[in-house]
Amino acid sequence: MPQLDTSTWFTTVLASSITLFILMQLKISFHDLHKKPSNKYLKLFKPTNPWEQKWTKIYSPLSLPQP
């Protein structure tokens, strides 16, 4: 039975590990992270109804004076 030649295993494992590391780094570097939400669209919004511009107080029936 012939002896198994293991002299190239170190080179094969090392090259595979380096290749896998490079591929994973490339995959991670192309991944886009979400940006934080900004308020630029809220500043452009203007209310169109007159009741949205002023504050109104709503009374609860239980808070009204009882006769």
Curated annotation (Swiss-Prot):
One of its GO terms (cellular component) is proton-transporting ATP synthase complex. The modification N6-succinyllysine is found at K54. GO terms for molecular function: proton transmembrane transporter activity. The keyword RNA-binding does not apply. The modification N6-acetyllysine is found at K54, K57. Belongs to the ATPase protein 8 family. Component of the ATP synthase complex composed at least of ATP5F1A/subunit alpha, ATP5F1B/subunit beta, ATP5MC1/subunit c (homooctomer), MT-ATP6/subunit a, MT-ATP8/subunit 8, ATP5ME/subunit e, ATP5MF/subunit f, ATP5MG/subunit g, ATP5MK/subunit k, ATP5MJ/subunit j, ATP5F1C/subunit gamma, ATP5F1D/subunit delta, ATP5F1E/subunit epsilon, ATP5PF/subunit F6, ATP5PB/subunit b, ATP5PD/subunit d, ATP5PO/subunit OSCP. Keywords: Acetylation, ATP synthesis, CF(0), Hydrogen ion transport, Ion transport, Membrane, Mitochondrion, Transmembrane, Transmembrane helix, Transport. InterPro entries: ATP8_mammal, ATP8_metazoa. GO terms for biological process: proton motive force-driven ATP synthesis. It comes from Cricetulus griseus (Chinese hamster). It is a single-pass membrane protein. Pfam families: ATP-synt_8. This is ATP synthase F(0) complex subunit 8. Subunit 8, of the mitochondrial membrane ATP synthase complex (F(1)F(0) ATP synthase or Complex V) that produces ATP from ADP in the presence of a proton gradient across the membrane which is generated by electron transport complexes of the respiratory chain. ATP synthase complex consist of a soluble F(1) head domain - the catalytic core - and a membrane F(1) domain - the membrane proton channel. These two domains are linked by a central stalk rotating inside the F(1) region and a stationary peripheral stalk. The keyword Mitochondrion applies. It is found in: Mitochondrion membrane. The chain crosses the membrane at residues 8-24.
